[in-house]
């Protein structure tokens, strides 16, 4: 899948899929352009 950046209270990290929990915001490269 497309690498996604997960942003949460613990910081920002990369994930290959959805972020764990609803307290994270997912940013995918295909959505950014």
From Swiss-Prot:
Top-rank lineage group of the source organism: Eukaryota
Compartments where located: Secreted; Nematocyst
Record key words, sorted: Disulfide bond, Ion channel impairing toxin, Nematocyst, Secreted, Toxin
Family the entry assigns: Belongs to the sea anemone type 3 (BDS) potassium channel toxin family.
Claim: Disulfide bond is one of the keywords in the record: yes
InterPro entries noted in UniProt: BDS_K_chnl_tox, Myo_ane_neurotoxin_sf
GO molecular function, one term: ion channel inhibitor activity
Disulfide bonds: 6-28
Any one Pfam family match given in the protein's UniProt record, by short name: Defensin_4
Chief place of localization: secreted
Name of the featured protein: Toxin Bcg III 25.52
Gene Ontology CC, one term: extracellular region
